[in-house]
Design a protein with these regions (language model features):
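Sec-dependent N-terminal signal peptides
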Residues: 4-13
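Active-site core of glycosidic bond-cleaving carbohydrate-active enzymes
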Residues: 65, 69-70, 378-411, 432-435, ...
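Acidic/His metal-coordination segments adjacent to aromatic residues that form catalytic metal sites
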Residues: 362-375, 426-442, 499-516, 649-664
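Catalytic cores of secreted or luminal carbohydrate-active enzymes
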Residues: 124-158, 163, 669-710
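C-terminal motif of bacterial Sec signal peptides marking the signal peptidase cleavage site
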Residues: 15-17
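Primarily short, surface-exposed interaction patches in extracytoplasmic proteins
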Residues: 330-339, 343, 361-375, 385, ...
């Protein structure tokens, strides 16, 4: 009992330190409202979304999905949920075991990895099938059917006076525009806890028969990165109206072995008709009209009357609560020319991460907007998607996706067993079933392994209780068991090695890589945390783990600079080693400093990377990672410079999305990384005693913050 009292007291003191004593509380309404996105034209990169973490609906400038084809190569007009998945038939009966290939990385046993094969044949095709399947579904487009007097469809170029706002404080998109001189007013919102959309429309075009609602359904493409809509194969799927009355309609969708339901309820009389296969028209009878549409996986939804109004009310209640709890950062008193833009990015990133990355599963890199990597999620990215929720005092949003790991345990355990290791090995690319996607790169990644320990520790810090230890302790232990058995002991030099891996910097090869600096530091940190969890559970420390922690190799360096890995002696000569993620900076940026590194060497490395790195070949989270490294090294000006670096992959669009390139127009790990860095640059980290340690003290960065949590 005394032990727990001390733990709770320590946590209380920590929380007290999370809110600085300010002269006045931040005006959160003003902070949020001044960053509302405003759209005035059709632009495929300005699509806005509503959602709740498990469901998202993305719209064009009409407030619905009226012109999806025009947005397909920008930010697609997606309708996605966490449960909406599909698999193509498997007539050849491929087995995952057919993708296994044996490797020997000098650990005393053979290891089986699920990989891709270059040679054509059954193994190649099996790997392709398991990469593509299952894939995330686009559940259907809901748009306006706008017609001219001659019956032709109105084109987007003919729509005028567009004025669209995302009201962040209420989670509602408000859109107005004119068609042939007549105004159309639209409100769009998502229910905060169900896969339900609410829409209200007011326009004289309705009574003229010139405005209807269309519903269009597609077959999945199975594409690597696209809107997942194939409209060319109507015979491969079915759309049935299984029940209807004056204001309630239930549709059943069948795609091979998968089914789902779409329930529509209007607030007045309407009719539903079929224009063509998978293309339905909803015709209202009043110039003021509202409806809800709910997507369900097993049975039709039961929707009460007046649900559109109730959904708008629930949306407002949820989002006002969201913005008034947890952390906030106000840059209105900062005079640096970049401050306003940084504030905009932070506000919009909070909204996007809440609607796209706060669901029951780890999110895909493009969230619930459109498919990337077939809609599957990457566990090495879960840190970037979710850690900020803890630092911004919204720990419940982190916990939502942590339960999935328990369901993935049997498969993660089997991966470790077939590779000859203890514990469990978290896979890189997967789906709700936890099936490992074969990969020539991903199957050899290892930096996702400690993430579970890191995130469980954040949950414990927020709620230091026996219940948290009970809930997560087993998986913390199993995760650490793998890490301990994976490290190879070098008897000649009396140290442990990490080898046979592809590092976070994916330009390194598994067969050559030894002791990449970030992974070694992460092993050091996470194994130490795992020992603390044993002590909290009244279990003695594992002596073998202590030996591992003590004998991990110091980070390899040359000429005062840290190497990409111990074998990469030409790190600063070969562009292969100075492209992709500058992961060496994560050894201090994402993690606390440790005995394996020298701060002066890390400063040298930071300076070299800022000046010379191949920044054209980087990713959105590389900038916040660099900023966090600079902040921990007491280089706040460099931290800000890194966070606001003017590079393509550090671009934030009008809607807040982190643009990467023509393939990845949405990249949520960048948004999450920005929020992690911003919180850390304000609230600091364990042992830090400086307010806003990540911002210069030259008078240009007068930053006000509240209710943020220090990083470990």
């Amino acid at each position: 009992m005394k032990k727990w009292l001390l733990v709770i007291l320590s946590a209380s003191l920590l929380c007290t330190a999370c809110t600085k004593d300010k002269a006045a509380k931040i005006d959160r309404l003003a902070l949020v409202e001044r960053n509302n996105p405003h759209v005035t034209s059709f632009d495929s990169l300005t699509a806005l979304s509503v959602g709740n973490g498990n469901f998202a609906f993305t719209v064009d400038a009409t407030g619905l999905q009226t012109y999806p084809e025009s947005y397909a190569k920008g930010i697609p007009l997606g309708t996605q949920t966490q449960w909406g998945w599909h698999s193509f038939p498997n007539p050849n009966n491929y087995k995952l075991e057919e993708t296994f290939k044996e490797y020997d990385f000098g650990r005393g046993h053979k290891e089986l990895y699920a990989v891709q094969f270059n040679e054509k044949g059954r193994q190649h095709d099996a790997a392709d099938w398991y990469r593509i399947n299952p894939h995330r579904l686009h559940l259907g487009n809901i748009g306006f059917e706008l017609t001219n007097e001659d019956g032709t469809l109105v084109q987007s170029k003919d729509i005028e006076s567009i004025d669209q706002h995302l009201d962040l404080w209420n989670g509602i998109i408000e859109s107005t525009f004119k068609v042939n001189g007549e105004i159309v007013e639209v409100k769009t919102a998502a229910h905060p806890s169900s896969d339900r959309l609410a829409v209200s429309v007011a326009s004289p075009l309705i009574s003229k028969g010139a405005l209807k609602i269309n519903l269009r359904f597609s077959y999945p493409t199975g594409g690597h990165a696209d809107d997942a809509c194939d409209r060319t194969v109507p015979n491969k799927h079915k759309t049935e109206v299984v029940s209807q009355d004056d204001n309630n309609y239930v549709l059943k969708r069948t795609l091979d072995a998968d089914t789902y339901f779409v329930t529509l309820k209007t607030d007045g009389k309407s009719t539903l008709s079929e224009k063509e296969a998978h293309y339905l028209l909803l015709t209202p009878e009043s110039d003021e009209f509202s409806f809800v549409c709910e997507f369900t996986d097993s049975a039709a939804a039961q929707i009460a009357d007046n649900n559109a109004g109730l959904t708008f009310d629930e949306s407002s209640k949820y989002w006002q609560d969201f913005w008034q709890r947890g952390g906030a950062i106000d840059f209105s008193n900062a005079t640096d020319s970049r401050a306003k833009e940084l504030e905009r990015r932070i506000i919009l990133s909070q909204y996007l991460m809440a609607i796209q990355s706060a669901g029951m599963y780890p999110p895909q890199e493009t969230g619930l907007t459109y498919n990337s990597w077939f809609g599957k999620f990457h566990l090495e990215m879960h840190w970037w998607h979710a850690v900020h929720f803890a630092l911004w005092n919204r720990i419940d949003l982190l916990e939502r996706s942590m339960d999935w790991y328990a369901t993935a345990y049997p498969i993660a355990k089997s991966i470790a067993e077939r590779q000859g290791f203890d514990g469990l090995r978290w896979m890189k690319m997967t789906d709700p079933s936890a099936t490992e996607a074969p990969s020539k790169v991903g199957s050899f990644l290892i930096w996702q392994q400690p993430h579970f320990i890191y995130m469980a520790e954040l949950i414990y810090r927020a709620n230091p209780s026996p219940e948290v230890i009970e809930k997560y302790g087993f998986l913390v232990e199993e995760t650490a068991k793998f890490m301990a058995s994976f490290a190879t002991y070098d008897e000649l030099e009396g140290r442990y090695l990490l080898k046979g891996i592809i590092a976070a910097q994916e330009t390194l090869r598994a067969s050559e890589t030894i002791n990449p600096p970030f992974e070694v530091s992460y092993w050091h940190y996470a194994m130490g945390v795992a020992q603390k969890w044993r002590e909290r559970a009244d279990t003695s420390r594992n002596m073998e783990w202590d030996e591992l922690i003590d004998k991990l190799s110091p980070l390899a360096s040359k000429d005062g600079l840290y190497l990409a890995s111990e074998d990469a002696l030409d790190t600063y000569i070969d562009i292969r080693f100075t492209s992709d993620h500058p992961a060496v900076l994560g050894a201090v940026g994402m993690l606390p400093q440790n005995k394996l590194l020298r701060p002066d060497y890390m400063k040298n490395t930071l300076d070299w990377i800022l000046e010379n790195w191949n920044w054209g070949k980087t990713w959105g989270w590389d900038y916040p990672m660099t900023a966090m490294c600079a902040a921990r090294l007491n280089e706040p000006a460099k931290a800000v410079d890194a966070l606001m670096m003017n590079k393509r992959t550090n671009t934030y669009l009008l809607n807040g999305h982190n643009y990467q390139d023509a393939r990845l127009r949405v990249y949520l790990p960048g948004n999450g990384g920005l929020l992690i860095a911003a919180a850390m640059m304000c609230a600091g980290w364990d042992g830090n005693e400086i307010d806003t340690p990540g911002f210069p003290k030259d008078g240009t960065w007068n930053v006000q913050w509240e209710d943020l949590v220090p990083m470990p």
